[in-house]
């Protein structure tokens, strides 16, 4: 019985996350798709989300968030990447992103964590959460 209740709870939680993701993407008027996946093609296994620029799809892990805020900020971080691709175009954005990674390498820092586009996405996600979504979806 406990196993069945746990599975039902996880399904309900996932349905809530799908609803939240759809509402937030609509808020930014993006054609970007959001899919839930337990693993991603690239990056490390600790990532909670990734943006596939070629297919304009955000992949989000369906579990592992301590709060709804954590989930929303992860989604917003990936939405920031999507908005930049739509603003600059794929080719130009990838060039800018790669250049920022090379600068980080040159400075002896991590290509991902020291990449200015990743730092901008993280800051933007936190700002947007406070501005628009803090009181919209509640942690239960």
Per-segment meaning from a language model:
Residues 2-13:
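Proteolytic processing junctions in secreted/extracellular precursors
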Residues 106-140:
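Long, well-structured alpha-helical subdomains associated
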Residues 12-32:
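Zn2+-dependent metallopeptidase catalytic core
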Residues 49-53:
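OB-fold/S1-family RNA-binding modules
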Residues 11, 15, 69-70, 74, ...:
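Soluble non-cytosolic domains of exported or imported proteins
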Residues 69-70, 85-119:
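Post-HEXXH active-site segment of zinc metalloproteases
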Residues 58-75:
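Short pre-active-site segment immediately N-terminal to the catalytic Zn-binding motif
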Residues 73-86, 121:
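Active-site recognition of the HExxH zinc-binding catalytic motif
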